[in-house]
Protein backbone atom coordinates (compact mmCIF):
# COMPACT_ATOMS: atom_id res chain seq x y z
CA UNK A 1 0.00 0.00 0.00
CA UNK A 2 1.29 3.44 -0.96
CA UNK A 3 0.96 6.17 1.68
CA UNK A 4 1.30 9.78 0.54
CA UNK A 5 1.89 12.30 3.31
CA UNK A 6 1.39 16.08 3.26
CA UNK A 7 -0.20 15.87 -0.18
CA UNK A 8 -2.39 18.97 0.14
CA UNK A 9 -2.70 22.01 2.38
CA UNK A 10 -6.38 21.36 3.16
CA UNK A 11 -8.95 18.56 3.16
CA UNK A 12 -8.63 15.97 0.38
CA UNK A 13 -12.02 15.19 -1.17
CA UNK A 14 -11.16 12.59 -3.79
CA UNK A 15 -8.34 10.29 -4.88
CA UNK A 16 -8.66 8.27 -8.08
CA UNK A 17 -6.35 5.86 -9.89
CA UNK A 18 -6.24 5.86 -13.68
CA UNK A 19 -7.31 2.91 -15.85
CA UNK A 20 -3.97 1.12 -15.44
CA UNK A 21 -3.56 1.88 -11.74
CA UNK A 22 -0.26 3.64 -12.44
CA UNK A 23 -1.26 7.25 -11.79
CA UNK A 24 -3.14 8.87 -8.95
CA UNK A 25 -5.09 12.13 -9.08
CA UNK A 26 -6.12 13.87 -5.85
CA UNK A 27 -8.14 17.04 -5.27
CA UNK A 28 -8.62 19.27 -2.27
CA UNK A 29 -10.16 22.32 -0.65
CA UNK A 30 -6.80 23.99 -1.34
CA UNK A 31 -8.09 24.44 -4.94
CA UNK A 32 -5.43 22.20 -6.48
CA UNK A 33 -5.21 18.83 -8.19
CA UNK A 34 -2.08 16.73 -7.80
CA UNK A 35 -0.93 13.98 -10.14
CA UNK A 36 1.33 11.20 -8.87
CA UNK A 37 3.10 8.37 -10.65
CA UNK A 38 2.75 5.21 -8.57
CA UNK A 39 5.93 3.14 -8.72
CA UNK A 40 5.50 -0.31 -7.23
CA UNK A 41 3.78 -0.82 -3.90
CA UNK A 42 5.65 1.74 -1.83
CA UNK A 43 7.02 4.49 -4.06
CA UNK A 44 5.36 7.48 -5.67
CA UNK A 45 6.40 10.65 -7.47
CA UNK A 46 4.54 13.96 -7.66
CA UNK A 47 4.54 14.89 -11.36
CA UNK A 48 2.10 17.82 -11.57
CA UNK A 49 0.08 20.30 -9.53
CA UNK A 50 -2.89 21.68 -11.46
CA UNK A 51 -4.44 25.04 -10.65
CA UNK A 52 -7.47 26.62 -12.29
CA UNK A 53 -10.43 26.26 -9.96
CA UNK A 54 -11.49 29.10 -7.67
CA UNK A 55 -12.99 26.97 -4.90
CA UNK A 56 -12.76 23.56 -3.23
CA UNK A 57 -12.47 20.74 -5.77
CA UNK A 58 -14.87 17.93 -4.95
CA UNK A 59 -14.10 15.22 -7.48
CA UNK A 60 -11.80 14.16 -10.31
CA UNK A 61 -12.35 11.51 -12.99
CA UNK A 62 -9.94 9.94 -15.48
CA UNK A 63 -11.18 9.40 -19.03
CA UNK A 64 -10.57 6.03 -20.68
CA UNK A 65 -7.03 5.91 -22.13
CA UNK A 66 -8.42 5.53 -25.67
CA UNK A 67 -9.15 9.28 -25.44
CA UNK A 68 -5.66 10.18 -24.18
CA UNK A 69 -4.41 11.37 -20.78
CA UNK A 70 -7.51 13.36 -19.86
CA UNK A 71 -8.89 14.30 -16.45
CA UNK A 72 -12.17 16.01 -15.50
CA UNK A 73 -12.60 17.99 -12.29
CA UNK A 74 -15.53 19.74 -10.61
CA UNK A 75 -15.65 22.41 -7.94
CA UNK A 76 -17.65 24.57 -5.59
CA UNK A 77 -16.92 27.38 -8.07
CA UNK A 78 -19.55 25.92 -10.42
CA UNK A 79 -17.02 24.91 -13.07
CA UNK A 80 -16.06 21.65 -14.70
CA UNK A 81 -12.54 21.71 -16.15
CA UNK A 82 -11.13 19.21 -18.63
CA UNK A 83 -7.37 18.73 -18.43
CA UNK A 84 -5.11 17.04 -20.99
CA UNK A 85 -1.50 15.99 -20.74
CA UNK A 86 0.67 16.54 -23.81
CA UNK A 87 2.60 13.33 -24.32
CA UNK A 88 5.74 15.00 -25.67
CA UNK A 89 6.13 17.58 -22.88
CA UNK A 90 4.14 15.87 -20.09
CA UNK A 91 2.61 19.27 -19.36
CA UNK A 92 -1.06 19.54 -18.37
CA UNK A 93 -3.37 22.22 -19.75
CA UNK A 94 -7.08 23.03 -19.65
CA UNK A 95 -8.68 22.08 -22.98
CA UNK A 96 -12.33 22.73 -22.08
CA UNK A 97 -14.35 24.58 -19.47
CA UNK A 98 -17.97 23.72 -18.69
CA UNK A 99 -19.70 26.61 -16.91
CA UNK A 100 -23.46 26.23 -17.40
CA UNK A 101 -24.32 25.29 -13.81
CA UNK A 102 -25.45 28.00 -11.38
CA UNK A 103 -24.06 26.44 -8.20
CA UNK A 104 -21.46 23.97 -6.93
CA UNK A 105 -20.77 21.06 -9.28
CA UNK A 106 -20.61 18.05 -6.98
CA UNK A 107 -19.62 15.13 -9.19
CA UNK A 108 -18.23 14.23 -12.61
CA UNK A 109 -18.36 10.80 -14.22
CA UNK A 110 -17.24 9.59 -17.65
CA UNK A 111 -19.58 7.28 -19.53
CA UNK A 112 -18.47 3.75 -20.45
CA UNK A 113 -15.94 4.30 -23.24
CA UNK A 114 -18.08 2.38 -25.74
CA UNK A 115 -20.53 5.31 -25.60
CA UNK A 116 -17.87 7.86 -26.53
CA UNK A 117 -16.27 10.75 -24.65
CA UNK A 118 -19.31 11.74 -22.61
CA UNK A 119 -19.21 13.41 -19.19
CA UNK A 120 -22.02 13.37 -16.61
CA UNK A 121 -22.10 16.29 -14.14
CA UNK A 122 -24.32 16.94 -11.11
CA UNK A 123 -24.90 20.22 -9.31
CA UNK A 124 -26.40 21.85 -6.24
CA UNK A 125 -28.57 23.89 -8.64
CA UNK A 126 -30.73 20.77 -8.94
CA UNK A 127 -29.67 20.02 -12.49
CA UNK A 128 -27.72 17.32 -14.29
CA UNK A 129 -25.72 18.02 -17.45
CA UNK A 130 -24.35 15.57 -19.98
CA UNK A 131 -21.51 16.87 -22.16
CA UNK A 132 -20.50 15.23 -25.45
CA UNK A 133 -16.94 15.77 -26.66
CA UNK A 134 -17.27 15.25 -30.40
CA UNK A 135 -14.63 13.88 -32.77
CA UNK A 136 -14.37 17.24 -34.57
CA UNK A 137 -13.28 18.99 -31.37
CA UNK A 138 -16.64 20.60 -30.63
CA UNK A 139 -18.79 19.99 -27.56
CA UNK A 140 -22.53 19.78 -27.06
CA UNK A 141 -24.57 19.34 -23.91
CA UNK A 142 -27.97 18.55 -22.48
CA UNK A 143 -29.00 19.98 -19.10
CA UNK A 144 -32.17 19.11 -17.21
CA UNK A 145 -33.82 19.31 -13.79
CA UNK A 146 -33.20 16.20 -11.69
CA UNK A 147 -33.50 16.83 -7.92
CA UNK A 148 -35.12 20.09 -6.82
CA UNK A 149 -32.84 20.97 -3.91
CA UNK A 150 -29.57 19.62 -5.26
CA UNK A 151 -27.94 16.65 -6.98
CA UNK A 152 -25.10 15.06 -5.03
CA UNK A 153 -23.80 12.26 -7.23
CA UNK A 154 -24.43 10.11 -10.30
CA UNK A 155 -23.25 6.82 -11.77
CA UNK A 156 -23.50 5.30 -15.25
CA UNK A 157 -25.05 1.92 -15.95
CA UNK A 158 -22.48 -0.47 -17.44
CA UNK A 159 -22.39 -1.00 -21.19
CA UNK A 160 -23.90 -4.44 -21.71
CA UNK A 161 -23.18 -7.22 -24.20
CA UNK A 162 -26.68 -6.72 -25.62
CA UNK A 163 -25.85 -3.09 -26.32
CA UNK A 164 -22.64 -3.98 -28.13
CA UNK A 165 -24.44 -6.13 -30.73
CA UNK A 166 -26.31 -3.14 -32.14
CA UNK A 167 -25.13 -0.43 -34.52
CA UNK A 168 -22.24 1.75 -33.40
CA UNK A 169 -23.54 5.01 -34.91
CA UNK A 170 -23.87 7.89 -32.45
CA UNK A 171 -27.66 8.10 -32.44
CA UNK A 172 -28.07 4.38 -31.80
CA UNK A 173 -25.48 4.42 -29.03
CA UNK A 174 -27.36 7.25 -27.32
CA UNK A 175 -30.26 4.84 -26.76
CA UNK A 176 -28.01 2.86 -24.43
CA UNK A 177 -27.17 5.82 -22.19
CA UNK A 178 -28.56 5.14 -18.75
CA UNK A 179 -27.50 6.43 -15.36
CA UNK A 180 -28.64 6.91 -11.78
CA UNK A 181 -28.62 10.11 -9.70
CA UNK A 182 -29.14 10.90 -6.02
CA UNK A 183 -30.12 14.10 -4.31
CA UNK A 184 -30.85 16.21 -1.27
CA UNK A 185 -34.56 15.39 -1.73
CA UNK A 186 -33.80 11.90 -0.28
CA UNK A 187 -34.51 10.34 -3.69
CA UNK A 188 -32.66 8.16 -6.17
CA UNK A 189 -33.63 8.41 -9.84
CA UNK A 190 -32.79 6.38 -12.94
CA UNK A 191 -32.59 8.16 -16.29
CA UNK A 192 -32.47 6.97 -19.89
CA UNK A 193 -31.89 8.88 -23.11
CA UNK A 194 -35.12 9.55 -25.04
CA UNK A 195 -34.33 9.82 -28.75
CA UNK A 196 -37.68 11.45 -29.54
CA UNK A 197 -37.30 14.20 -26.93
CA UNK A 198 -33.50 14.39 -27.38
CA UNK A 199 -33.02 14.57 -23.63
CA UNK A 200 -32.98 12.24 -20.63
CA UNK A 201 -36.27 10.93 -19.25
CA UNK A 202 -36.90 9.64 -15.74
CA UNK A 203 -37.22 5.85 -15.90
CA UNK A 204 -37.68 5.12 -12.19
CA UNK A 205 -37.84 6.91 -8.85
CA UNK A 206 -36.45 4.96 -5.89
CA UNK A 207 -37.67 5.91 -2.43
CA UNK A 208 -36.16 4.45 0.72
CA UNK A 209 -33.86 6.94 2.39
CA UNK A 210 -35.01 9.44 5.03
CA UNK A 211 -32.25 12.03 4.57
CA UNK A 212 -29.95 13.36 1.86
CA UNK A 213 -28.53 10.65 -0.42
CA UNK A 214 -24.83 11.48 -0.60
CA UNK A 215 -23.54 8.94 -3.11
CA UNK A 216 -24.72 6.36 -5.61
CA UNK A 217 -22.82 3.62 -7.43
CA UNK A 218 -24.07 1.31 -10.17
CA UNK A 219 -22.26 -2.02 -10.12
CA UNK A 220 -20.02 -2.43 -13.18
CA UNK A 221 -21.21 -6.03 -13.57
CA UNK A 222 -24.74 -6.91 -14.69
CA UNK A 223 -24.08 -10.63 -15.11
CA UNK A 224 -26.77 -11.76 -12.65
CA UNK A 225 -28.90 -8.64 -12.26
CA UNK A 226 -28.35 -4.90 -11.89
CA UNK A 227 -27.14 -3.66 -8.49
CA UNK A 228 -27.17 -0.06 -7.31
CA UNK A 229 -25.75 1.04 -3.94
CA UNK A 230 -26.77 4.31 -2.27
CA UNK A 231 -25.14 5.95 0.75
CA UNK A 232 -27.10 8.42 2.84
CA UNK A 233 -26.94 10.95 5.61
CA UNK A 234 -29.54 8.78 7.37
CA UNK A 235 -26.62 6.46 8.29
CA UNK A 236 -27.73 3.66 5.97
CA UNK A 237 -26.59 2.09 2.73
CA UNK A 238 -29.27 0.52 0.54
CA UNK A 239 -28.72 -2.09 -2.16
CA UNK A 240 -31.21 -1.84 -5.02
CA UNK A 241 -31.87 -4.72 -7.42
CA UNK A 242 -34.19 -4.98 -10.41
CA UNK A 243 -36.47 -8.01 -10.77
CA UNK A 244 -37.62 -9.67 -13.99
CA UNK A 245 -40.65 -7.37 -14.14
CA UNK A 246 -38.40 -4.32 -14.13
CA UNK A 247 -39.32 -3.24 -10.60
CA UNK A 248 -36.60 -2.05 -8.23
CA UNK A 249 -36.41 -3.41 -4.69
CA UNK A 250 -34.09 -2.36 -1.88
CA UNK A 251 -32.55 -4.01 1.14
CA UNK A 252 -30.34 -2.39 3.78
CA UNK A 253 -26.70 -3.37 3.65
CA UNK A 254 -26.71 -3.92 7.42
CA UNK A 255 -29.42 -4.66 9.97
CA UNK A 256 -28.18 -1.86 12.21
CA UNK A 257 -27.50 1.66 11.05
CA UNK A 258 -23.91 2.80 10.57
CA UNK A 259 -22.56 4.83 13.52
CA UNK A 260 -22.40 8.02 11.44
CA UNK A 261 -23.35 9.50 8.07
CA UNK A 262 -22.41 7.38 5.04
CA UNK A 263 -20.53 9.57 2.57
CA UNK A 264 -19.34 7.35 -0.27
CA UNK A 265 -19.86 3.89 -1.73
CA UNK A 266 -17.83 2.22 -4.46
CA UNK A 267 -17.86 -1.17 -6.20
CA UNK A 268 -14.81 -3.26 -7.03
CA UNK A 269 -14.06 -3.66 -10.75
CA UNK A 270 -15.67 -7.11 -10.73
CA UNK A 271 -18.76 -5.73 -9.00
CA UNK A 272 -18.81 -8.26 -6.15
CA UNK A 273 -17.30 -6.15 -3.34
CA UNK A 274 -18.75 -2.88 -2.07
CA UNK A 275 -16.67 -0.35 -0.13
CA UNK A 276 -18.41 2.16 2.17
CA UNK A 277 -16.86 5.20 3.86
CA UNK A 278 -18.51 7.40 6.45
CA UNK A 279 -18.29 9.94 9.18
CA UNK A 280 -16.79 7.36 11.54
CA UNK A 281 -13.54 7.58 9.48
CA UNK A 282 -13.75 3.91 8.51
CA UNK A 283 -13.84 2.17 5.14
CA UNK A 284 -15.69 -1.15 5.36
CA UNK A 285 -15.99 -3.87 2.70
CA UNK A 286 -19.13 -5.92 2.01
CA UNK A 287 -20.00 -8.98 -0.05
CA UNK A 288 -23.25 -10.76 -0.87
CA UNK A 289 -23.50 -14.35 0.38
CA UNK A 290 -25.27 -17.27 -1.31
CA UNK A 291 -28.47 -16.45 0.57
CA UNK A 292 -28.59 -12.96 -0.91
CA UNK A 293 -27.62 -11.26 2.34
CA UNK A 294 -24.73 -8.83 2.66
CA UNK A 295 -21.97 -9.58 5.11
CA UNK A 296 -18.73 -7.94 6.17
CA UNK A 297 -15.70 -8.71 4.01
CA UNK A 298 -13.25 -6.71 6.10
CA UNK A 299 -12.12 -3.20 6.81
CA UNK A 300 -9.51 -1.04 5.11
CA UNK A 301 -6.85 -0.05 7.61
CA UNK A 302 -6.33 3.70 7.45
CA UNK A 303 -3.12 5.46 8.35
CA UNK A 304 -3.71 7.91 11.20
Curated annotation (Swiss-Prot):
One MF term in the entry's GO annotations: structural molecule activity
Alphabetized InterPro entries for the sequence: Sec13/Seh1_fam, WD40/YVTN_repeat-like_dom_sf, WD40_repeat_dom_sf, WD40_rpt
Superkingdom of the organism of origin: Eukaryota
Alphabetic keyword roster: Cytoplasmic vesicle, Endoplasmic reticulum, ER-Golgi transport, Membrane, mRNA transport, Nuclear pore complex, Nucleus, Protein transport, Repeat, Translocation, Transport, WD repeat
WD repeats: 7-46, 52-93, 100-141, 146-201, 208-250, 257-296
Keyword hit for Transport: yes
PROSITE patterns: WD_REPEATS_2, WD_REPEATS_REGION
Entry-linked SMART domains: WD40 (SM00320)
Topology in the lipid bilayer: Peripheral membrane protein
Quaternary structure and interacting proteins, as annotated: The COPII coat is composed of at least 5 proteins: the SEC23/24 complex, the SEC13/31 complex, and the protein SAR1. Component of the nuclear pore complex (NPC). NPC constitutes the exclusive means of nucleocytoplasmic transport. NPCs allow the passive diffusion of ions and small molecules and the active, nuclear transport receptor-mediated bidirectional transport of macromolecules such as proteins, RNAs, ribonucleoparticles (RNPs), and ribosomal subunits across the nuclear envelope. Due to its 8-fold rotational symmetry, all subunits are present with 8 copies or multiples thereof.
Family classification: Belongs to the WD repeat SEC13 family.
Name assigned to this protein: Protein transport protein SEC13
Organism: Lodderomyces elongisporus (strain ATCC 11503 / CBS 2605 / JCM 1781 / NBRC 1676 / NRRL YB-4239) (Yeast)
Taxonomic path: Eukaryota, Fungi, Dikarya, Ascomycota, Saccharomycotina
